[in-house]
């Protein structure tokens, strides 16, 4: 994949560098300085384009704009999410470059030619299971009190998420959670185009679990409904694609609470609507009856999550 990143952008860099220098360090395609710089800038720019395009399409065409009036939505949250994401990207790209550089030098198991179409489902499944497991444990590790406050808390600033929350991380947090995807192709063979598609799909999935569109209340697939609980209550649903490791690790929480067939987010949505129309006369949070304005009851959800937080 690194060779494509360089090859298709070489003409742009050739033209730009030839305007300002004659040094082979920047003009030669074999120069490590040029390769490292080009990889870094490409990762930064393409990462930003993918993030802004994916999150913006979601935000303007699918995201419920009413969510912006939610009492737990922060002032200027969308702007702050975009700022943190774009601020982090260049740093994330710096530490990501070695993965691409050593891939270019032939250390990965990526390959160009497919021998059989059966290699696709096998590699997809392997990539999916491998990253699902490691992202779970890395994410859970980031909730350890020794690192949580400086590393992962920035992402938990957002109690109610928007599509732009997806990459709104500390740069090392975003990098840490992307490492399993990079590591996979150093351990297992994968067809290059499939890796590229999987990598983009991973980014889009990240956006989708923050977009407030609860398309699934599936028991196996980890959706936005589950990740919403993670942002509100901290100690549940650390997974990325499936609920498997949350179940094994004892951190699974179903989006269905006390009421059969009634989803947690639906309760929040109703309470939000009630707030917009005045006061609610009763709120059921965590099975306890509470009375008062919606802001109070939803704050109680977050407060209970805070009380319950014990790192692991
Ligand atoms: Zn988290
Ligand atoms: Zn999140």
Where are these regions (language model features)?
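Alpha-helical transmembrane segments in multi-pass membrane proteins
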Residues: 29-92
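Alpha-helical transmembrane segments of multi-pass membrane proteins
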Residues: 47, 51, 124-135, 181, ...
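Function-critical hydrophobic alpha-helical transmembrane segments in multi-pass membrane proteins
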Residues: 117-156, 165-166, 178
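Juxtamembrane helix-loop-helix connectors linking adjacent transmembrane helices
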Residues: 70, 79, 94-130
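Cytosolic/stromal cytosol-facing helical appendages immediately following the last transmembrane segment
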Residues: 1-37, 60-74, 145-312
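Core segments of transmembrane alpha-helices
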Residues: 87-96, 103, 172-185
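Hydrophobic alpha-helical transmembrane segments
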Residues: 36-44, 86, 121-125, 175, ...
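Membrane-water interface at transmembrane helix exits
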Residues: 54-63, 96-104, 135-143, 185, ...
């Amino acid at each position: 994949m690194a060779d494509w990143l360089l090859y298709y952008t070489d003409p742009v860099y050739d033209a730009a560098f030839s305007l300002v220098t004659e040094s082979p360090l920047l003009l030669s395609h074999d120069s490590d300085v040029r390769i490292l710089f080009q990889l870094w800038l490409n990762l930064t720019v393409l990462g930003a384009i993918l993030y802004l395009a994916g999150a913006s399409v979601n935000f303007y065409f699918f995201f419920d704009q009413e969510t912006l009036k939610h009492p737990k939505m922060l002032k200027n949250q969308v702007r702050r999410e975009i700022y943190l994401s774009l601020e982090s990207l260049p740093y994330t790209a710096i530490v990501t470059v070695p993965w691409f550089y050593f891939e270019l030098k032939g250390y990965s198991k990526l390959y160009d030619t497919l021998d059989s179409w059966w290699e696709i489902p096998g590699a997809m499944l392997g990539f999916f299971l491998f990253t699902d497991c490691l992202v779970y444990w890395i994410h859970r590790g980031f909730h350890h009190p020794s690192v949580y406050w400086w590393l992962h808390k920035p992402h938990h600033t957002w109690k109610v998420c928007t599509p732009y929350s997806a990459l709104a991380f500390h740069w090392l947090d975003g990098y840490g959670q992307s490492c399993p995807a990079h590591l996979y192709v150093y351990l297992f063979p994968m067809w290059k185009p499939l890796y590229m598609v999987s990598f983009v799909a991973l980014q889009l999935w990240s956006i989708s679990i923050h977009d407030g569109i609860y398309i699934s209340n599936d028991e196996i697939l980890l959706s936005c409904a589950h990740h919403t609980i993670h942002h509100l209550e901290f100690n549940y649903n650390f997974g990325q694609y499936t609920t498997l490791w949350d179940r094994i690790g004892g951190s699974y929480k179903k989006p269905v609470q006390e009421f059969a067939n009634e989803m947690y987010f639906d309760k929040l949505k109703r309470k939000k609507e009630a707030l917009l129309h005045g006061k609610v006369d009763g709120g059921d949070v965590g099975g306890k009856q509470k009375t008062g304005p919606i802001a109070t009851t939803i704050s109680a959800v977050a407060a209970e999550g805070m009380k319950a937080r014990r790192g692991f």
